């Protein structure tokens, strides 16, 4: 028992009253597209394993092989003595695929955004306080990185490039380096940024474009390498993850050689973290071999999204501006979203309810994450369950 347990308990009770308390549930591995949860196998529509690679035999084989050959851990941070040839091999392969001069591995997407942004703003401080323009719906890790650096965010309306350009023009004569920080695919809404237009806007206003590609990597863009590929040379830094479309773990930044060398020297999340272990590197390496060849899987995934969005629209369920494998069923009330998720689970489907503070108040939803591992029969099951479940929730309200 700790000295602050009474405070912790009170906070949990308040969260429960607001219907936003979370609890961990026991999950076990199953074939792609499914999940054993609390001892029951469900069709999984909540996973970020968009291409079904997390259970791909090549990833498992190479992870095992590299661990056997090179050990279970890297033993230290890369600047001390943990910089293996494997790290540089994977970074070189990734840079070739991304079409950038260099790439740098990091431990997670959250760590990348939380640590890379402060490092960038520190370098820019020589020109005065940086101007940091951020999308209002950016991921929490991007906001955290800005807050950790102590910079003021100039927020533009979601995906509204006219508003962004207006804000930039308003401050045209102000000192300080300019940064535009946004996502290519937004994790809770499934919509995408117009990356070529963003890149052109950034060029006009001499702004550094930071693009979070966590939910695009593997799934969208040329060879599945993200939407930055639609604007060659126009994105200054692309951040992405290996834990979603690539089925493994970890994150990266890709950009110029000078940028990556600077981050080796200035990014706390790189400097003070033990390097990724050989098994993880092996899985990443295998995924990078597979992903460029998975055009059919990507086409299947986009087809699933189009079909589901049409079904939700026919049922009167708002799915926002989704155009990707992430399809929100926006319910509004947190209690109704929880009830719909429970109805789906009763019918053998997992689609987790997302509530505040993850999404704004009044926009609670089921975040439906599709996978190329889902078949048409499973999509049929989801569509039927959503229709029946939504009727049941409305009748009970």
UniProtKB/Swiss-Prot annotation:
Pfam families: Aminotran_1_2. It catalyses: 6-carboxyhexanoyl-[ACP] + L-alanine + H(+) = (8S)-8-amino-7-oxononanoate + holo-[ACP] + CO2. The keyword Transferase applies. Substrate binds at residues 22, 139, 358. One of its GO terms (molecular function) is pyridoxal phosphate binding. Its cofactor is pyridoxal 5'-phosphate. One of its GO terms (biological process) is biotin biosynthetic process. Pathway: Cofactor biosynthesis; biotin biosynthesis. Catalyzes the decarboxylative condensation of pimeloyl-[acyl-carrier protein] and L-alanine to produce 8-amino-7-oxononanoate (AON), [acyl-carrier protein], and carbon dioxide. Homodimer. This is Putative 8-amino-7-oxononanoate synthase.
């Amino acid at each position: 028992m700790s000295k602050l347990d009474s405070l912790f308990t009170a906070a949990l009770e308040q969260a429960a009253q607001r219907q936003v308390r979370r609890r961990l549930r026991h999950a076990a591995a199953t074939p792609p597209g499914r999940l054993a949860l609390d001892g029951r196998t469900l069709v999984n529509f909540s996973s970020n394993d968009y291409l079904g690679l997390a259970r791909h035999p090549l990833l498992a084989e190479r992870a095992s092989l590299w661990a056997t050959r090179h050990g279970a851990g890297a033993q230290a941070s890369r600047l001390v003595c943990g910089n293996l040839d494997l790290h540089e091999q994977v970074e070189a392969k990734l840079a070739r695929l991304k079409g950038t001069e260099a790439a740098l591995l990091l431990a997670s997407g959250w760590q990348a955004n939380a640590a890379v942004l402060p490092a960038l703003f520190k370098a820019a401080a020589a020109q005065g306080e940086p101007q940091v323009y951020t999308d209002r719906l950016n991921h929490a890790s991007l906001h955290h990185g800005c807050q950790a650096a102590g910079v003021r965010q100039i927020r533009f309306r979601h995906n509204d490039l006219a508003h962004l350009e207006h804000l930039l023009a308003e401050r045209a004569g102000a000192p300080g380096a300019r940064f535009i920080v946004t996502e290519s695919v937004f994790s809770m809404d499934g919509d995408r940024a117009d990356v070529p237009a963003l890149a052109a806007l950034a060029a006009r206003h001499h702004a550094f474009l930071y693009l979070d590609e966590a939910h695009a990597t593997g799934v969208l863009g040329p060879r599945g390498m993200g939407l930055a590929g639609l604007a060659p040379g126009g994105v200054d830094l692309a951040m992405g993850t290996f834990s979603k479309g690539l089925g493994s773990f970890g994150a990266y930044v890709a950009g110029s050689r000078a940028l990556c060398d600077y981050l080796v020297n200035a990014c706390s999340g790189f400097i003070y973290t033990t390097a990724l272990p050989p098994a993880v590197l092996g899985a990443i390496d295998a995924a990078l071999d597979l992903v460029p060849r998975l055009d059919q899987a990507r086409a299947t995934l986009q087809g699933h999204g189009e079909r589901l969005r049409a079904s939700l629209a026919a049922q009167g369920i708002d799915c926002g501006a989704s155009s990707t494998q992430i399809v929100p069923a926006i319910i509004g009330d947190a209690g109704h979203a929880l009830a719909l998720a429970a109805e789906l689970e009763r019918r053998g489907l997992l689609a987790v309810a997302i509530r505040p503070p993850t999404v704004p108040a009044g926009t609670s939803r089921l975040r439906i994450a599709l996978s190329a591992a889902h078949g048409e029969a499973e999509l049929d099951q989801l569509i039927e369950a959503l229709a029946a479940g939504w009727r049941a929730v409305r009748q009970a309200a």
